């Protein structure tokens, strides 16, 4: 075993010594804090805490007038790890992770839509009420479906994950269709009043594809010409070779006629 490096435990002592020697112009603000809360000196490392996945469900209990909230605890399976990874922090998982994975697996093109990731105060979620899918000040996206599905699971009695997913997905399709219709009608109204829009994304993509095809066609023609030139240099010019073969055949015919006449 190598020697223990206890330099981090002596940070305060070194700072005090440097201050008394006049090397520090100003006392560090953390000096008194490290005196009150010194770093641990225990060299035995404990295994990290195993986080549990707690799920809230409303279930109808026989004999009860109202559905009761039931908390289900799912223990995480402890997988054998290498000795070097034994003390690494355990990954924290939430119930939304599986719902989010399932939705974006079924709707991969939702990830291609632009999204706003900047929050004003970091507590924007407190203003949202997921009893309905569409929220004020938030664009409709896949995260709305995930939060709506989670709300249904936590607040509707005897709700299953598949049923909540179908309800949230149906509402999402209806609102997304409404947005597309509103966008199309707004564009038609603007064009009727004289507005001129540029090319759409589909048209831009087709133009880029056509340019790439024309560039490839020119490259293919050039490669074909170079291939023909290399073949001609190896076998000779096709026209000259054909003329030589024809001349040789005529000479052979003449020789045969002379031999027959003799």
Curated annotation (Swiss-Prot):
Subcellular location(s) per record? Mitochondrion
Q: Which InterPro entries match?
A: Ribosomal_mS23_fun
What is the species of this protein? Aspergillus niger (strain ATCC MYA-4892 / CBS 513.88 / FGSC A1513)
| Key words of the record | Mitochondrion, Ribonucleoprotein, Ribosomal protein
The similarity annotation says:
Belongs to the mitochondrion-specific ribosomal protein mS23 family.
GO cellular component terms given for this protein:
mitochondrial small ribosomal subunit
What's the domain of life for this entry? Answer: Eukaryota
Q: Which PANTHER family match?
A: 37S RIBOSOMAL PROTEIN S25, MITOCHONDRIAL, SMALL RIBOSOMAL SUBUNIT PROTEIN MS23
Q: Where is this region: Disordered?
A: 242-262
Q: Does the keyword Mitochondrion apply?
A: yes
Which Pfam family name is an example for this entry?
A: MRP-S25
What is the designated name of this protein? Small ribosomal subunit protein mS23
Which residues fall in a compositionally biased region of kind Acidic residues? 242-254
Provide a Gene Ontology MF annotation, just one. structural constituent of ribosome
Assembly: Component of the mitochondrial small ribosomal subunit.
